[in-house]
Structures are given as C-alpha cells and as structure tokens.
C-alpha cells in the first residue's frame, strides 16, 4: 500500500516499547531521518469482527500523526482492498480525531482522501484514555468512540460492490503507529 512503501523495518525497538503494561510508540527525527514507531498484527481478523483499541496521546506533538487502522492482507494494490482508519489525529485540528474509510470506489486510482467522519466534538481531548472501535460486517462498518456510535459506512450493494465495499473480501490486520513529519 501507499503507506508501507515509505517505511522500512529497522533493527531494534527504539521507538516501540512496553512500559508498565502499556505499548508506547514514539517518533523522532535523527540526522534528518524521520523514525516512526509502529506495530502491526501478522494475522488478519475476519469479517463479522469488532476491534477495540484503548489509546491516548501523551502530548500534542507538532508534526505528529498517530493512527489506529486496518489494512487487508493479500489484497491487490491500495485502495482496492480498502482501508479502515479507527482513529487518526493531526496537529491542524488538535481537539478532533478522524475516522476514515478508503476504497477504490471512493479514492479512484490515485486519490488519497477517503470518506471521513470528523468527531463533531470540537473539545475532544486526545490526551485522555479513549476506546476506539469498529465493527465490520457484510452490511456495514460501524465506528465507536468510548462505546458511543460515531458513524456508519454502509455496503450499497452496487454492481461494482467489491470496489465500494471490499471489507469482507479479505482478513484485515491492525496497525498502531505514530509517525512524524506531516504538515496537516
């Protein structure tokens, strides 16, 4: 996918660690090179799955771009297999989170913007613990924050259904990452 082509695995865990039972991700700029922290599951989760992640930011970092998201395993090039963003945060809107869906039907060949639900609460404090969740079924994706439904992306059962709703064609892994260097 477009995201992974810009990153490479490195030896060591300088930006990923477990401390007091919590996974901690960090990012830094080292000699002009951005080093991001992230983890992903090697196995995928099937359709009819609810995924929940409890997370918080320890600070609002300029250029920071944390995300909790899912990508299909074994799908053709992005965005044909879809992408599910349970939570993204950008410095340009520090008191909001974004939940986004990407598909070929939405994005086309080269577009990057998906269908996004901006959390309507303009005073959302990302430095507090929150539970971000998505339920993935044949019918729809249902997004939640702290147990409250935030929005739905429905399968429209179009002739080109796999382009509009590919979310049950593949298993999806989970990715947790904290990137640095964005200007959003």
Describe each model-derived feature in a short phrase.
Residues 1-184:
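GH16 jelly-roll
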């Amino acid at each position: 996918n477009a995201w992974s082509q810009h990153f490479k695995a490195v030896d060591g865990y300088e930006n990923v660690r477990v401390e007091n039972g919590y996974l901690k991700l960090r990012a830094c700029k080292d000699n002009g090179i951005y080093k991001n922290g992230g983890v992903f599951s090697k196995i995928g989760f099937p359709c009819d799955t609810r995924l929940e992640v409890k997370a918080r930011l320890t600070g609002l970092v300029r250029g920071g771009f944390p995300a909790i998201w899912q990508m299909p395993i074994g799908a053709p090039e992005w965005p044909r297999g879809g992408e599910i963003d349970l939570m993204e945060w950008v410095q340009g809107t520090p008191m909001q989170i974004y939940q986004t869906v990407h598909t070929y039907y939405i994005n086309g060949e080269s577009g990057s913007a998906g269908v996004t639900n901006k959390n309507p609460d303009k005073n959302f404090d990302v430095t507090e613990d929150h539970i971000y969740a998505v339920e993935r079924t044949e019918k729809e994706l249902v997004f939640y924050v702290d147990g409250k439904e935030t929005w739905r992306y429905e399968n429209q059962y179009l002739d080109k259904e796999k382009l509009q709703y590919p979310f049950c064609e593949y298993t999806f892994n989970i990715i947790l990452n904290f990137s640095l260097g964005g200007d959003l």
